[in-house]
């Protein structure tokens, strides 16, 4: 079986060295994208995704650094402006995570499960401050008994610490393993209500990012046009029909949501004294959806991107991208319809 998340000489898998770059100007090329981001380290792969027929930019791309710490350096240097336009870099996620609806969510709040009775809120602050500025840490307790319910929420001043924390599953506090997931507000599940006529994450009336086909943005996504940050925003208070990626070129946004089917909620809940009992939704947040939605049946992450061959920079790509459906002009974005691959 081919390892699609290749490690470098330092044992760092590809996804921890890769950034997705959204909101690109239609003029941005591989070279200009590389020229900007190589300020923070050696880039071994870069690609601006283009429509295979028109050869116009879809408004997003990927860069892969030689070392993981270079991703940290680039993220710490935000905001980034490429070719006169502020772009939105986001950490890549492993391909195995593509079935998780929260994988691409942009939130500042973290759900922490597996909280033991001896753990205190200061323990959470002390542990997670290595990732960024902790705004608040709250262990949820039973309103009547005041006993800890086994989970907590930690909020940061930025979304990137949450992304980085969720890329690692090996977190321990006081020698005990804890579970971490992005805390999504109730009602912000992908799928569910039907999408609008505005385009998916690529403009037009094409599918959302995901869908039931094995392509980026298959036509099954988001009820006729899932959007990234459209009428049903992922992040607290953001979106709402505005706040879209890609701007005037069709960009990321519009319509409904990311795409795919199932909603948040199902599965387990951290409830009563730390035990589990039915639906992960707690205190207004969904901690970890169990059903597919984001990405549908597709097994590669948005962070996987255009995977190069073993020769690295300039090799052949193996990741499928859809080439049908409507596009978002110069701004473009993930996803536009159809089934063919190239």
From Swiss-Prot:
Residues 189-230, 237-278, 293-315, 327-342 have a biased composition (Gly residues). The keyword Ribonucleoprotein applies. GO terms for molecular function: mRNA 3'-UTR binding. InterPro entries: Nucleotide-bd_a/b_plait_sf (IPR012677), RBD_domain_sf (IPR035979), RRM_dom (IPR000504). SMART domains: RRM. Keywords: Nucleus, Repeat, Ribonucleoprotein, RNA-binding. Pfam families: RRM_1. Residues 180-342 are annotated as: Disordered. SUPFAM superfamilies: RNA-binding domain, RBD. Coiled coil: none annotated. GO terms for cellular component: catalytic step 2 spliceosome. Its main location: nucleus. It is found in: Nucleus. One of its GO terms (biological process) is mRNA splicing, via spliceosome. Residues 17-93, 108-185 form the RRM domain. This protein is a component of ribonucleosomes. PANTHER family: HETEROGENEOUS NUCLEAR RIBONUCLEOPROTEIN A1, HOMOLOGOUS TO DROSOPHILA SQD (SQUID) PROTEIN. This is Heterogeneous nuclear ribonucleoprotein A1, A2/B1 homolog.
